Amino acid sequence: MVNMKASMFLTFAGLVLLFVVCYASESEEKEFPKEMLSSIFAVDNDSKQEERDCVGYMRECKEKLCCSGYVCSSRWKWCVLPAPWRR
């Protein structure tokens, strides 16, 4: 009877330990994407502060030229991707 109680206690303690380890690793994994996104947006904000000579996709292109890879739409005056069906 004592051996059965001891084995049940050890099994229960092992399951609790497994739960704690899994929870800790999962919480670390949840923090990793948040850190990556914050670092990406921090870099992105720094690049937005620089003044550019061209404008990007779906930006108004009346005064400034579109960046490479885009053309100014004659109809909407926005920078768009060049396509064969556009004139």
Swiss-Prot record:
* InterPro entries for this protein: Huwentoxin-1, Huwentoxin_CS1
Q: Does the keyword Secreted apply?
A: yes
Q: Where is the signal peptide?
A: 1-24
**Keywords recorded for this protein, A-Z:** Disulfide bond, Ion channel impairing toxin, Knottin, Secreted, Signal, Toxin
Q: Which cysteines are joined by disulfide bonds?
A: 54-67, 61-72, 66-79
Q: Does the keyword Transcription apply?
A: no
Could you state one GO cellular component term attached to this entry?
extracellular region
Positions annotated as propeptide: 25-52
Indicate where this protein resides in the cell: Secreted
Tissue and organ expression note: Expressed by the venom gland.
Matches recorded under Pfam families: Toxin_12
Subcellular location, principal: secreted
Domain writeup: The presence of a 'disulfide through disulfide knot' structurally defines this protein as a knottin.
Its family?
Belongs to the neurotoxin 10 (Hwtx-1) family. 51 (Hntx-8) subfamily. Hntx-8 sub-subfamily.
Its annotated function is as follows: Ion channel inhibitor.
Name the record gives this protein = U3-theraphotoxin-Hhn1h
